[in-house]
C-alpha cells in the first residue's frame, strides 16, 4: 500500500471536524490496505505499536532539525528559525522539502510497510552510533517521499500527528470497514480488554469476529480499568443497589494493574502505560507474595510514611513516576502499598464474568498481607449509620471516601465501563460540588500584573464521548501556588497549537490554544447555565451550555489519565440534574 494514500486521507481529514466525515475517510483508507493493515492502523493512531509496548522513535524536534539541515544543506540555525515561525516540526519538514525539492529520482514511492519498518528500526536502535542511525533513517524517508508525506511522517515520529481523531473514532471505522455496527458494543468491550487496534482490525478482516467478541483479560496485556459512577449520599447508593452492596475505601493513589506469569511481573497504569521499572520494590514483593502460575490484579498504589504508616496523597507518588535513577533510595524514602480490590484472571481462568462477591473471596484467599500488598478495607452493609461511620473513618485514614460495589449476581468486571455496579461516594464539600472533576486543558490566557510573564488562566474542557470532542466548561485561574503558576508555560510548551485543535469545540478564543493532552483535577461551587461555554450546548437550555462556577485547582495533575479519561459531558449533565434535584428538595 502506497503511503501517498495515507497522506491523501490525512489531507482530507484536516479539512473537516465532523466525526461522520472523518470516519468515512478512515473506512475508505482501511479498506484499501492489504498486508499493511496492522501497520496502517498504528500509523493512523500516530504510534508504532500499542501504548503498553512503550515503543517510541526517540527522535526529538531538535534531532529532526539536525536531520533536516543535513538533507537540505540548510544551516541548522535557519531550520530553527523556520520552526520558531511555524511552531510545528511537521510543517517545517514540509516547507523545507518543498523548497529544496529533495526527493530522489531513483527512489520508488514510499509504502506503509516501509515507513513503519523504518520507524520501528529507529525506535529499536541503541548504543553508540544510534543517533546517527536515526538521522540516516529519517534522511532516507525525506528523500523517498513527497513534502506532504514527510510532514505526516515527521509528526508521527515526534508523537504529534493530531489529525483530529481518537482511538474511539478509529475503532468505529474498523467496525464499519470489517464488521457490522450491530456488534459495536461487543467489539468495544473486546478492545477495552485488549487495547490493540491493529490486532483487532486484522482479526476482524480475517473474519474472526467470534474470537474478538470473546476476548477477555490476557496476562501481560493491560486492559482499560472498570470505573465508578457517582452519587452524593449513602441512602441513594443503598437504594440504587437494592441493599446488596459492599463499601470499600477509596484510596488517593495511582490505579495499578499487576500482571504475573510465573516469575515475570509487569505493572501498568490506568492509561495502559507500563510502570514496572518505576516500582522495583513492588515487583520484588509481588514475586514473593503471590504463589500462582498467572494472575491479573487491580488495585491502588499509595505512598505512605514509613515511620508513622500515614498515607500520603496522590501527588507524592509522582516523585516515583518517570524516574530512572536512585530508585532504591526513593523506594525507601517513599514506600508504596498496593491496596488490592479486584482480581480478573487467575491460573488461566478469566474471572471477569464472575460476580464481585466471588472475585473478592478469591482475592482474600490469594495472599498474606504485608507492607507492599494489602486488601482494600471494606464492609458489607446496607445500614446507613454503619456505612456513614465507615465513611468517616476512611476520611480520617487519609482516603477520598468510599466505593460501593454491587453484590448482585451480575456484578461482573466491565473493563473501561462506568456503570452503576460501582458507585463512588466522596467527601461532601459544603457549598461546593460534591465531587472533584477531571478536566482537559485546551487553551491558556496570558497573565497581567503579578502574573505577567506566565499564563493567568486556563481554558478547560469536558470530553464528549458521542462526538469525540472536547467542550469548554470553565476558565481556571484559582488554586495555583506561585511555583506552579510560573511553570505553566513550560509544562504546556510541547502542546501549544497555532490553531484551534480539530477536536476542540469552543466559542471562546484563548491567547494560546493547547492540544488536548493534560488533565487536571478541580473543584467548584456549582454547575451553572452558560451562554459562552460549549459543554452540553443546547441540551439543558437552547443556545446555552453548562459551566463550572468558581473553579479551583486542587493541586492534582492527573498524569495517570488520558484526555479521553477526563470527566465527560454526560457526567456534567447528570451532576447538574442532581444539583437541581437537591436544591428543589432543600426548598421544599
UniProtKB/Swiss-Prot annotation:
Record Gene3D superfamilies: DNA ligase, ATP-dependent, N-terminal domain (1.10.3260.10), DNA ligase/mRNA capping enzyme (3.30.470.30), Nucleic acid-binding proteins (2.40.50.140)
Record's function text: DNA ligase that seals nicks in double-stranded DNA during DNA replication, DNA recombination and DNA repair.
Cofactor: Mg(2+)
HAMAP family: DNA_ligase (MF_00407)
GO molecular function term, any single one: metal ion binding
Gene Ontology biological-process annotations: cell division; DNA biosynthetic process; DNA recombination; DNA repair; lagging strand elongation
Keywords of the record: ATP-binding, Cell cycle, Cell division, DNA damage, DNA recombination, DNA repair, DNA replication, Ligase, Magnesium, Metal-binding, Nucleotide-binding
NCBIfam families: dnl1 (TIGR00574)
Annotated binding of ATP, by residue: 248, 255, 270, 300, 341, 418, 424
UniProt entry tagged with the keyword Cytoplasm: no
Active site: 250
Entry's EC annotation: 6.5.1.1
Domain of life per record: Archaea
Protein name from the UniProt record: DNA ligase
PANTHER family xref list: DNA LIGASE 1, DNA LIGASE 1/3 FAMILY MEMBER
PROSITE patterns from the UniProt entry: DNA_LIGASE_A2 (PS00333), DNA_LIGASE_A3 (PS50160)
Similarity remark: Belongs to the ATP-dependent DNA ligase family.
Catalytic activity: ATP + (deoxyribonucleotide)n-3'-hydroxyl + 5'-phospho-(deoxyribonucleotide)m = (deoxyribonucleotide)n+m + AMP + diphosphate
Organism: Thermoplasma volcanium (strain ATCC 51530 / DSM 4299 / JCM 9571 / NBRC 15438 / GSS1)
Amino acid at each position: 500500500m502506497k503511503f501517498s494514500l495515507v497522506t491523501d486521507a490525512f489531507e482530507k481529514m484536516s479539512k473537516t471536524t465532523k466525526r461522520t466525515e472523518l470516519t468515512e475517510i478512515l473506512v475508505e483508507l482501511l479498506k484499501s490496505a492489504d498486508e499493511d493493515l496492522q501497520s496502517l492502523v498504528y500509523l493512523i493512531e500516530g504510534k508504532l505499536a500499542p501504548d503498553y509496548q512503550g515503543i517510541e522513535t526517540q527522535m526529538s524536534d531538535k534531532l529532526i532539525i539536525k536531520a533536516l539541515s543535513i538533507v537540505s544543506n540548510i544551516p541548522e540555525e535557519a531550520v530553527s528559525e523556520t520552526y520558531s515561525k511555524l511552531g510545528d516540526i511537521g510543517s517545517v519538514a514540509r516547507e523545507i522539502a518543498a523548497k529544496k525539492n529533495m526527493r530522489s529520482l531513483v527512489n520508488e514511492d514510499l509504502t506503509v510497510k516501509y515507513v513503519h519498518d523504518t520507524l520501528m528500526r529507529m525506535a529499536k536502535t541503541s548504543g553508540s552510533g544510534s543517533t546517527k542511525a536515526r538521522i540516516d533513517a529519517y534522511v532516507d524517508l525525506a528523500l523517498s517521499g513527497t513534502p506532504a508525506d514527510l510532514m505526516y511522517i515527521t509528526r508521527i515520529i515526534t508523537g504529534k500527528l493530531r489529525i483530529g481523531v481518537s482511538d474511539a473514532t478509529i475503532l468505529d471505522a474498523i467496525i464499519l470497514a470489517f464488521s457490522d455496527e450491530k456488534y459495536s458494543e461487543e467489539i468495544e468491550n473486546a478492545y477495552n480488554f485488549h487495547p490493540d487496534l491493529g490486532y483487532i482490525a486484522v482479526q476482524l478482516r480475517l473474519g474472526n469476529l467470534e474470537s474478538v467478541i470473546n476476548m477477555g483479560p490476557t496476562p501481560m496485556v493491560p486492559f482499560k480499568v472498570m470505573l465508578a459512577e457517582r452519587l452524593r449520599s449513602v441512602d441513594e447508593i443503598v437504594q440504587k443497589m437494592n441493599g446488596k452492596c459492599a463499601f470499600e475505601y477509596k484510596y488517593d493513589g495511582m490505579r495499578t494493574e499487576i500482571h504475573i506469569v510465573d516469575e515475570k511481573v509487569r505493572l501498568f497504569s490506568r492509561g495502559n502505560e507500563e510502570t514496572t521499572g518505576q516500582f522495583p520494590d513492588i515487583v520484588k514483593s509481588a514475586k514473593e507474595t503471590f504463589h500462582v502460575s498467572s494472575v491479573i490484579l487491580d488495585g491502588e498504589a499509595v505512598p505512605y510514611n514509613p515511620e508513622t504508616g500515614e498515607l500520603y496523597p496522590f501527588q507524592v507518588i509522582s516523585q516515583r513516576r518517570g524516574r530512572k535513577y536512585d530508585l532504591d533510595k526513593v523506594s525507601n524514602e517513599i514506600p508504596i502499598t498496593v491496596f488490592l480490590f479486584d482480581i480478573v484472571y487467575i491460573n488461566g481462568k478469566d474471572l471477569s464474568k464472575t460476580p464481585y462477591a466471588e472475585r473478592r473471596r478469591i482475592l482474600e484467599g490469594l495472599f498474606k498481607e504485608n507492607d507492599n500488598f494489602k486488601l482494600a478495607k471494606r464492609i458489607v452493609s446496607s445500614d446507613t449509620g454503619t456505612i456513614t461511620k465507615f465513611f468517616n473513618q476512611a476520611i480520617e485514614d487519609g482516603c477520598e471516601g468510599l466505593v460501593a460495589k454491587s453484590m448482585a449476581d451480575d456484578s461482573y468486571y466491565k473493563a473501561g465501563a462506568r456503570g452503576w455496579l460501582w458507585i463512588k461516594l466522596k467527601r461532601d464539600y459544603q457549598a461546593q460540588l460534591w465531587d472533584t472533576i477531571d478536566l482537559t486543558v485546551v487553551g491558556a490566557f496570558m497573565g497581567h500584573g503579578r502574573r505577567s510573564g506566565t499564563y493567568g488562566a486556563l481554558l478547560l474542557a469536558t470530553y464528549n464521548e458521542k462526538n469525540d470532542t472536547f467542550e469548554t466548561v470553565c476558565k481556571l485561574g484559582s488554586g495555583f501556588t506561585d511555583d506552579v503558576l510560573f511553570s505553566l508555560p513550560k509544562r504546556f510548551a510541547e502542546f501549544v497549537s497555532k490553531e484551534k485543535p480539530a477536536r476542540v469545540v469552543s466559542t471562546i478564543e484563548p491567547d494560546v490554544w493547547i492540544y488536548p493532552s493534560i488533565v487536571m483535577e478541580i473543584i467548584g461551587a456549582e454547575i451553572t447555565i452558560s451562554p459562552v461555554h460549549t459543554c452540553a450546548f443546547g441540551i439543558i437550555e437552547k443556545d446555552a451550555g453548562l459551566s463550572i462556577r468558581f473553579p479551583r485547582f486542587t493541586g492534582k495533575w492527573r498524569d495517570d489519565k488520558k484526555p479521553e479519561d477526563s470527566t465527560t459531558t454526560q457526567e456534567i449533565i447528570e451532576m447538574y440534574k442532581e444539583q437541581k434535584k437537591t436544591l428543589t428538595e432543600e426548598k421544599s
